[in-house]
Each structure stands twice: as C-alpha cells, then as structure tokens.
UniProtKB/Swiss-Prot annotation:
Involved in repair of UV radiation-induced DNA damage. Catalyzes the light-dependent monomerization (300-600 nm) of cyclobutyl pyrimidine dimers (in cis-syn configuration), which are formed between adjacent bases on the same DNA strand upon exposure to ultraviolet radiation. This is Deoxyribodipyrimidine photo-lyase. Monomer. The keyword RNA-binding does not apply. One of its GO terms (molecular function) is DNA binding. Its EC number is 4.1.99.3. Disulfide bonds: none annotated. Binds 1 FAD per subunit. Binds 1 5,10-methenyltetrahydrofolate (MTHF) non-covalently per subunit. The occupancy is 0.2. Usually had equal molar flavin and folate. Pfam families: DNA_photolyase, FAD_binding_7. It is an enzyme of class 4 (lyase). It catalyses: cyclobutadipyrimidine (in DNA) = 2 pyrimidine residues (in DNA). GO terms for biological process: DNA repair; response to light stimulus. Keywords: Chromophore, DNA damage, DNA repair, DNA-binding, FAD, Flavoprotein, Lyase.
Amino acid sequence: MRLVWFRRDLRSFDNTALTAALNSGDPVAAMYIATPEQWHQHHLAPIQADLIWRRLAELQQELAALNVPLFYQQVADFQAAAVAVSQLAKTLNATQVLANRDYELDEQQRDQLAQQLLSEQGIIWSAFDDKCVLPPGSVRTKQGEFFKVFTPFKRAWLTLFQPPVIGKNRPVALWNVPSALAELVWHPEQAFDYPRIDSTPWAADFETVRAQLRDFCRERVQDYHQARDFPAREGTSSLSPYLAIGVLSARQCVARLYHESSMGELSEGAQVWLSELIWREFYQHLVAIEPNLSKSRDFVEWGARLEWWNDNEKFQLWCEGKTGYPIVDAAMRQLNQTGWMHNRLRMIVASFLTKDLHIDWRWGERYFMSRLIDGDYAANNGGWQWCASTGCDGQPYFRIFNPVSQGEKFDPNGDFIRRWVPELRSVSSAYIHQPWTYPAVNSVLYPARLVDHKQEREVTLRLYKTAKG
C-alpha cells in the first residue's frame, strides 16, 4: 500500500507524487488534512479555503477513476497533521508515504516531523519536487551559488529548461476501504472549521481549468505583452488561483504554451508570460533556500533599519479603498469584493502603502494573504518585498509609483475606476484620476486624499537613504 499526502497540489494529472505511487503497482490511497489553526496563523483567505473545499470534491472523483480513495481529516496544525498521516499510514499498513514538497519553513518542519514519525514505524517517506518546472537548487551560477538577481536566473533557467512531456496516469487495482476507516473517506458534506467565502466564480473542476489554459495559450497570449497592464481589459490568464492550490502545475502551463506555439517559437506575448512563470519559480527557489523569508524578514540587511510610521487609521482606509486616489481605491475594492487583483494594481497599491503611507510591507503582505484567492506565500512575499525595495532584486528604492500617472497610463478612460468606485461614475475622464481638481468636487461623495504624493515621495527618499546609511 502506498499513501499519497495531498497539500497544495490538488490534481490527479501531472502530479509527481501520485504518479510515482501509481507506477509502484501497489494499491494506492490518498489523504488531505485540513489545519484550521495553522491556516489562521498563515492568514489563509476564506475565499481560497472555499476553493480548496470545492476542489477536494472534484479531486475525489478524479482519484476514484484511478481506484484511489481520498481520506480526509481535520486537525489543528501542521504538527498534528504529521501525526495524523503517520497514524493513517500505520493503520493502512502502508509501506511508503509520498508527498510533493512545500518550500516554506513551517511546511519543511512539518515534513521533517512526518519523516521522523514514519521512520520510527519502518515506513518510507518520499518527497518530490513538483511545484516548479526546475526544482530549487538546480539553477545556480557558474560558481555553484544561488542567484540573487532575476535576469541572470532567467537566462540560466532557459538554458536548462526543456519543454516538458506530460503523460497520463493508469488506474491501479481496486481495493476496499476497511469499515473502520469508512468515516475518514472524504464526502462533500464535510466542511472545514474555518471561515469560507463563496468562490464559485472560479472553476474547481480540472477540465474547465485546463480549457481556460488552452484557450489563453491559443487565443490571447499573443497580445499578453500589450494587454496585461490594463485592468479594464481581459489581458491576463487568471490562472493564478489554480497554480496556488495546485489544480494546475507550472509544467502544464509551460507545456501548453509550447504546444500552442508555432513550430515551437514563442510569440512576444508568450515569451513575456513565460517570463512571469519564471518569476514565480524565482520566488519559490528563494523561499526554499532562504529560511528568513518565511520569518517575514527583509531580504536586504538594511531593511531592518527602515522607519515605518504604521498609522492604523490610514492602513484601514487603504484596506477599504478609501485613500482618495481612484486607481488605488478601485484596486482595493476589487480585491475585497472578488478575492483577486490585477497584477499591475498589486504593484500600485503596494507602492502606495509602503512609500506614500510609510506602512510596513508586512502589514500589506498579511492583508493580501487574508483576501487573495490566489494567495501563495513565496509569490506574495516576493512581490511585496520587490515593491518595498527590501527584497531580492527589488525595485530601486527611489522608484516610487505615482498613483495618478499610473491610473492615467493604464486606465486612461477611467473604465476600471468607474466599475469599482461608483462615486466617480459621473466624473469625466479629464478629472477622474485627480478628482480633487474636479470643479464640482463637493458634489461627489468620495474621500479626500489621505496624503499628497509629491510630499510623501520626498519623505520616502529620506527614510530609505537613512536606512541604507
């Protein structure tokens, strides 16, 4: 008997651990363990919890077609999860537990405990690199060191990369679940002891998600480099939630991208999308090799000396989308209402929080994780530290997004703003990015500016220069 432990890899197709178990020729069982207390500590978004719950029902059906039952337990935290998986493995008389690696520190420690408990029972623990196309540690400098800058990492990644070939799984022999374990089999009536927000606008079944990937790579990726920065357009893939919980693998995305390309030659848009996938790999690799990133520490040494003002009232207004800067407010309201935010907008609001309001990037990082359906620790941490200029290969500290010019450039007619900030629907495009200049501003029920961007830019330059010494 082989037991596969699912975590953030909720798919039966192109799942390294599952494929290894199926290829063993032995009966296979699967397990998912919910850890609500740990999720609270990690600020898991209720909308992502709901997507995970819905996905489990789909995964159970996919596994049933392979004659693999899905067991489910809810325990408090990662330590209890390690105990639970070792107990189930013992009960099943499993000879091996297989799982795909998570790279964050808490997750690594969970797996170390599981390995220890299983070893004491004579059960083999096998962990696989499945989250990335190229596993952490495989992309190094000529001196054998890890890359700390993205561009040379990308060049090395492309040199090592070969378009993946993805095969199909074959069912294993059917086996009957012991009656003593019947109550542990997943059924849709089960629910997490954790808040959930409806995620049904996002598909949970693999075929719909796979079709979305196919259609994007076939029909829209060619314009990705031009369309991706405009939030009013459908210019992005919207696949990030499925990468975050593992409905899709990065390999599947890259394989489909090349499959739909002409003679294996990527268009400019396809190259830019591939570059974004490599950014994702870069941040995953960093988290795997830099434990301090999992402790919410600045990547750069001088980041610890940065002075943050951390005004609670201003932070709350930022969270609610009431800063008086329309593109910032539209973005935050999109996040709060849908659980998703366009990538260009993530950079704008992160820059505004850290460099206009002088609020610690960790506050924004946690808030994003608590709201995003595509919350992924490595990507979220990497993005926030990039914007705050404290991260690995972060933007220069003197690069400070102007929320007015960003809105004018990427939402020139104000279509996105009008969608999410109804107070400004009657304001013409000439004034919508700076409503404080609107002649009839007193008739508009929209917040005044929290701060003056020009003044706060000078403050930021001073604070960062002081921290850098």
